[in-house]
């Protein structure tokens, strides 16, 4: 079995985090190696009340705000598995089998940088033909150059290969990371029938890197 670690970023929104974890564990059907949550708000302990409810999760805190990308680098440095399933604290999963589905796709091409699990109707990012049938699931490639600078790389819920990571902070923000991988020929895939939707509308937290 392919080993997968989950890394989740949060920023002192424990109500959203709890809902995200509730839905994740309700619909996840894959055996995980580890599950890490890193909170970057600087409010140490803000998520501690969730420890009893989710005993398999490792809760980490930055004592001072580092920014999302540096927090991700910090957690990825602890990942020892070939794959990392990356999520944030404001998502709702609603269908089983999302990690298995991603694993069926991620290694089909060395240039697949990530496989999205987001409902395609929940994102404005367009896809391009053709639609591939992978074990009965429709999969499409995300378009390069959406809105001039988005090429598919995302911190939205998605599976990534840890070997493709060598430190994000040295590249820049999410937008700049997307450009970096695009220039190296990488692309992303998304399912025609998704597995999760964004649940944090109107609750955006300004990142230190913005």
Question: PLM features: residue spans?
Answer:
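Glycine-rich, basic loop-to-helix element that forms the pyrophosphate-binding segment
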Residues: 62-78
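Short beta-strand-to-loop element that shapes/binds the nucleotide-sugar donor at the catalytic cleft/hinge
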Residues: 113-129
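A conserved acidic beta->alpha catalytic loop
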Residues: 37-47
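Conserved donor-nucleotide/metal-binding helix-loop-beta segment in metal-dependent transferases, i.e.
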Residues: 96-114
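Short, acidic, metal-binding catalytic loop of nucleotide-sugar glycosyltransferases
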Residues: 23-32
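C-terminal catalytic/acceptor-binding lobe
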Residues: 139-141, 150-210
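N-proximal low-complexity "stem/linker" segments adjacent to membrane-targeting elements
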Residues: 1-22
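Short beta-strand-to-loop acidic/aromatic patch adjacent to the donor-nucleotide binding site
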Residues: 82-92
